[in-house]
Every structure is written in structure tokens, then in C-alpha cells.
């Protein structure tokens, strides 16, 4: 019950926001499965229209950002919440940001792709909210930084990636670029090329 009171109940516009059972169950199931299986395992939560998907995403993002393993180290370095539509991005940003008011915990990427690159490489933000369309530009920025010898990269970091509307956002060039950025494949490839040229 303390987890429910401390992690799920939220006051918004003078009213108390309380999870419905399916929302609470979804978040708890993802957290339990992550403890059991660790990072790197795909999970799927399905919601019908109007069932509070944005709140479930927000609660899940915050729960995963606070998750620590048996060694007390965070299981994920960052949680990246991705949507494929700008209109939904604004709504989702407001929902996720509304649950935690600790400065620097959440970064809303609503400007340039450089902002996303900085948030992924930096240490401040625990939850990053962005659109899928920004990742192809981040690959280019990372490659340019690596070529100039200024690459910080994300190699060795663990990301929890929450994709809104996964059925429409998990294929194509943008997703390939997302995987390159978050797995460090592109940075590693660029460094290999630079070493070969030296």
C-alpha cells in the first residue's frame, strides 16, 4: 500500500489522480519482470482507447527510473519515452512531467536533436521524452562529434525505452537510427573507421 500511495497517487488541478487496476497491474508487472529478467527484454502493454495509456506510460517511466538492483545500482541509466507523433508528444510530455517535480529528473525534448543528444550523453536527466523523428539527426550529430574527436557517446549505458503507439513506431529507418544511438553501434563503427584511417 505504501508503494501505491507513494508512487501512484498524484494531485492534478485540484483532483486526486489514482490508477485504475489495469494501470497499476501493468506497471507492477513490468517492474516485477524487470527485477526477474533484468534489462534488455521486450515487454508489451496493450490498452484500449480512453483507458489511460498516457498515465500508465508516465507511472512506468518513473518506476523504471527509480529501479535498483540487488547491488543498489540503478538497473537503467535512463528511461526514454518515445512517441511517433508531435501532438501526442506534447500530451505525453505534460503527463510524465506532471508526476515528478524534481528539477532535472525529466527532460522534455521539444527543440533540436542536439538537445536529445546532450540528454542521452549527460548525467542529469533520468527520464527523456522525445519523438522518434529526432533520432536520425542524433546519429548524424554523434558521427560528426566522433569524427571531430569529441564523442561522449552512450556506450555502456542501459536504457529503458518506452514506445507509445508501438504498432506504428517500431519499424523503418527512424527505429534503425534509434537502435544505433542507444546501443552505441554507430559510434563504435565511426571510431573503427577513424582508427583505420589513422
Residues of each region from the PLM?
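ATP-dependent helicase/translocase motor core
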Residues: 1-79, 83, 87, 91-103, ...
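Signature of the SF2 helicase/ATPase Hel1-core->accessory helical subdomain module
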Residues: 132-198
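Short alpha-helical segments and helix-capping/turn motifs at coil-helix boundaries
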Residues: 64, 111-116, 145-148, 198
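Flexible phosphate/Mg2+-sensing switch loops adjacent to catalytic phosphate-binding sites
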Residues: 66-77, 104-109, 185-198
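Conserved catalytic network of the ASCE P-loop NTPase/AAA+ motor domain
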Residues: 72-74, 120-123, 151-155, 184
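Conserved motor-coupling elements within RecA-like helicase/translocase cores
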Residues: 112-128
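Short, glycine-/Ser/Thr-/acidic-enriched flexible segments
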Residues: 50-51, 85-88, 127, 133-136, ...
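Hydrophobic positions in the central parallel beta-sheet of the AAA+
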Residues: 81, 128-130, 161
Amino acid at each position: 500500500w505504501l508503494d501505491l500511495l507513494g508512487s501512484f497517487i498524484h494531485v492534478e488541478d485540484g483532483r486526486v489522480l489514482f490508477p485504475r487496476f489495469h494501470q497499476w497491474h501493468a506497471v507492477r508487472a513490468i517492474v516485477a519482470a524487470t527485477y526477474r529478467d533484468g534489462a534488455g527484454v521486450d515487454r508489451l502493454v496493450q490498452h484500449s482507447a480512453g483507458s489511460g495509456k498516457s498515465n500508465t506510460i508516465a507511472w512506468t517511466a518513473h518506476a523504471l527510473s527509480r529501479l535498483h538492483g540487488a547491488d543498489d545500482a540503478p538497473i537503467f541509466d535512463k528511461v526514454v519515452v518515445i512517441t511517433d507523433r508531435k501532438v501526442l508528444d506534447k500530451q505525453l510530455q505534460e503527463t510524465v512531467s506532471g508526476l515528478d517535480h524534481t528539477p532535472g529528473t525529466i527532460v522534455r525534448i521539444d527543440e533540436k536533436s542536439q538537445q536529445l543528444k546532450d540528454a542521452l550523453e549527460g548525467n542529469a536527466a533520468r527520464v527523456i521524452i522525445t519523438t522518434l523523428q529526432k533520432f536520425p539527426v542524433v546519429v548524424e550529430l554523434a558521427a560528426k562529434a566522433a569524427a571531430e574527436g569529441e564523442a561522449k557517446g552512450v556506450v555502456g549505458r542501459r536504457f529503458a525505452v518506452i514506445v507509445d503507439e508501438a504498432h506504428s513506431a517500431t519499424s523503418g529507418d527512424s527505429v534503425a537510427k534509434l537502435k544505433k544511438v542507444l546501443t552505441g553501434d554507430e559510434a563504435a563503427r565511426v571510431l573503427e573507421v577513424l582508427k583505420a584511417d589513422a
